[in-house]
């Protein structure tokens, strides 16, 4: 499960993600340079199923996945859908592919899509019906949890409001502090989550400007402020065959 926030700064944007998982899950791999359908992108890879929960491509598009409840062994990993959709060159194309993909073998999820200069979009699947929200701004931050999902969402949003009250404008530093926060106390409801059976296992920070995309990744709980791994990718708006 995850907590996801973002900020737009003109055509640029920044995306922040805490990934929460049970201790029984295998650790993810560090971010990699990958290619799918001729599209280059950056993503860490899930250790169990080979998909990803967050990715950014050379068109400047980012996707962040929030699972809505556990899947079953018979279902396709939702992270593999992210790997397929991130090959699209535009947010419109991502929405189009989402609309035509057979989702019957996927458990419920919410997928955030970000593109330079455009409102964030939400693509949702509840296991029966799909939905699209063209402007997800009012929904920020996005929260999913397998334990008390409504309570976690309410408390984490309240935590962000307290952080925002300290500054007249939302800044990247505010969101960085938010994602490392234990307020009001470290536990199941805190943004940096700690439970007996699960915890926040990684923090990812994506930045996209007019020239390149950067993905910074910390394995482990973000409250520890461990040194992370960073990759960059030059943006390309030309036909893919012309991109270096």
What role is predicted for each listed range?
Residues 1-244:
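N-terminal nucleophile
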């Amino acid at each position: 499960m995850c907590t996801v926030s973002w900020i737009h700064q003109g055509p640029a944007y920044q995306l922040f993600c805490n990934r929460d998982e049970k201790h029984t899950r295998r650790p993810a791999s560090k971010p990699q340079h990958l290619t799918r359908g001729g599209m280059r992108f950056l993503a860490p890879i899930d250790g169990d199923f080979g998909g990803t929960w967050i990715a950014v491509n050379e068109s400047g598009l980012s996707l962040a996945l929030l699972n809505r409840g556990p899947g079953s062994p018979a279902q396709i990993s939702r992270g593999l859908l992210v790997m397929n959709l991130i090959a699209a060159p535009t947010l419109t194309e991502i929405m189009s592919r989402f609309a035509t993909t057979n989702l019957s073998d996927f458990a419920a999820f919410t997928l955030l899509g970000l593109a330079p200069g455009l409102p964030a979009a939400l693509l949702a699947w509840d296991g029966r019906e799909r939905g699209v929200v063209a402007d997800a701004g009012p929904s920020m931050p996005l929260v999913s949890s397998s334990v008390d999902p409504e309570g976690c969402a309410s408390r984490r949003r309240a935590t962000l409001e307290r952080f925002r009250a300290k500054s007249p404008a939302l800044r990247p530093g505010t969101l960085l502090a938010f994602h490392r926060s234990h307020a009001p106390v470290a536990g199941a409801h805190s943004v940096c989550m700690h439970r007996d059976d699960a915890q926040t296992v990684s923090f990812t920070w994506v930045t996209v400007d007019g020239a390149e995309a950067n993905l910074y990744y910390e394995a482990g709980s973000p409250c520890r402020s461990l040194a992370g791994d960073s990759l960059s990718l030059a943006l390309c708006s030309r036909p893919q065959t012309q991109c270096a």
